Amino acid sequence: MAAKIRQNDEVIVLTGKDKGKRGKVTQVLPNGKVIVEGVKIITKHEKPVPALGKAGGLVKKEAAIDASNIAIFNPKTNKADRVGFRFEDGKKVRFFKSNNEII
């Protein structure tokens, strides 16, 4: 089954404290969550690992956000958009539902 949201897609957050923020998808997780660059920043406490030369402390990183809370961003309309699938030249392609443009 093809995914509507893929790595390197430009997306916009629809709900939550980061509503309206845009960013690139850095990772798509198999449990229906995605990691978006610059969205849902959390602070993790990491222990030092002297054997690896890793210092401990507070580390800021992106946390996973549910895929239902984001939508793909359409640069032509400058809005969130829905994704559809169709076959062109024997290949399955994704397209924006608002203007039928191939992604």
From Swiss-Prot:
Pfam families: KOW, ribosomal_L24. Keywords: Ribonucleoprotein, Ribosomal protein, RNA-binding, rRNA-binding. SMART domains: KOW. One of its GO terms (biological process) is translation. GO terms for cellular component: ribonucleoprotein complex; ribosome. One of its GO terms (molecular function) is rRNA binding. Part of the 50S ribosomal subunit. Belongs to the universal ribosomal protein uL24 family. One of two assembly initiator proteins, it binds directly to the 5'-end of the 23S rRNA, where it nucleates assembly of the 50S subunit. One of the proteins that surrounds the polypeptide exit tunnel on the outside of the subunit. PANTHER family: MITOCHONDRIAL RIBOSOMAL PROTEIN L24. This is Large ribosomal subunit protein uL24. It comes from Actinobacillus pleuropneumoniae serotype 5b (strain L20).
